[in-house]
Amino acid sequence: MKNVYFLSDAHLGSRAIEHGRTQERRLVNFLDSIKHKDSAVYLLGDMFDFWYEFRLVVPKGYTRFLGKLSELTDMGVEVHFFTGNHDIWCGDYLSKECGVIIHREALTTEIYGKEFYLAHGDGLGDPDKKFKLLRWMFHSTTLQTLFSAIHPRWSVELGLTWAKHSREKRVDGKEPDYMGENKEHLVL
């Protein structure tokens, strides 16, 4: 029987997380622990805190994680990557170089006779008009083309700073409940 794993919101590379390299190593160690099993992995968005692929450039870093994804797919492990609001700008690098299956939309699939609706969750049913406008802007091919014209030295810096600011913002002036050691929501 195939083992199926669901992971999301690692936010690798985040400047708001104190020990980012340690976090990446822990994630890679977990993925390493499942590599010999008949398994499938669903990465449900925001695995990176900011990911933007330029035509010939991808963000610096994430070497251990990208290498482990490549190793898993080379061994026949099915790895599904759903884009989230921090990594919506995936081109074809992850699929061509690492062998992952990219999903830009929600997926309904059957696993062990049960139907699953898989998505990052960003914007699902969110009525906030400002958020919808921002989401539209991030998905606009015209704005992506303009952003691509900015040298990666500045655009990646802008993206990482924006992501850090977004993470540090408080919801209604309070910290949300059920936060883990890296200030991530815990869902049990």
Question: Which residues does each predicted region cover?
Answer:
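Short hydrophobic-aromatic micro-motifs
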Residues: F6, E115-A119, D126
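Charge-rich, low-complexity amphipathic helices
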Residues: N29, D49, L56, S70, ...
